[in-house]
UniProtKB/Swiss-Prot annotation:
Gene3D superfamilies: Peptide deformylase (3.90.45.10)
Gene: def1
Active site: 136
Positions that bind Fe cation: 93, 135, 139
Protein name stated in the entry: Peptide deformylase 1
Example of a GO MF term: metal ion binding
Organism: Corynebacterium glutamicum (strain ATCC 13032 / DSM 20300 / JCM 1318 / BCRC 11384 / CCUG 27702 / LMG 3730 / NBRC 12168 / NCIMB 10025 / NRRL B-2784 / 534)
CC cofactor: Fe(2+)
Length: 169
């Protein structure tokens, strides 16, 4: 297991759609383990494979610090909202350091996918975990949370990014 480099805003891999996983092999298990290490090292609650430069439809999550929270991974994730109810809250991203903004997401979603052995998995999530599922699946579709912001919030976020030391290396 290893901590991998988190790709930052501006890297083309972050705006590329990840490929479906068809081979459930040792390299996939290693990727998942490395993603957990990377997420934990960075202090995140979720991480998509393209954030570590791998275009495979995999994400890991850990909301176990909250009551009823879970820790796990999902391969080839698909989600659907269970109601039209939404939540709005601060959202950030390991690939866009120092930027957080109010983002609206569905409150409750049903997630389905596969585990590292190819077995079906699924559950209903709400709150932070539902937000995480939507955020990480967006990543796998090549969509950054900045696209979910209203124009004024996006402009402010882009100003912070352009002024940041990490972006101007």
């Amino acid at each position: 297991m290893a901590v991998r480099e988190v790709r930052l805003f501006g890297d083309p891999v972050l705006v590329s759609r990840a490929d479906e996983v068809v081979d459930f092999d040792e390299s996939l298990s290693t990727l998942i383990d490395d993603m957990f290490d990377t997420m934990e090292d960075a202090g995140g609650v979720g991480l998509a494979a393209n954030q570590v430069g791998v275009l495979r439809r995999v994400f890991v999550f850990d909301t176990s610090h909250q009551e009823g929270g879970l820790r796990g991974h999902v391969i080839n994730p698909v989600w659907e909202p269970l109601t039209e109810d939404t939540q709005t809250g601060k959202e950030g991203c390991l690939s866009i350091p120092d930027v957080s903004a109010e983002t609206t997401r569905y409150e409750t979603v049903r997630l389905s996918g596969q585990d590292r052995d190819g077995n079906p998995v699924g559950f209903v999530a709400n709150g932070l975990l539902a937000r995480c599922i939507q955020h990480e699946t967006d990543h796998l579709d090549g969509v950054l949370f900045l696209k979910r912001l209203d124009p004024a919030e996006r402009k402010a976020a882009m100003g912070v990014i352009r002024a940041s030391a990490w972006f101007n290396k």
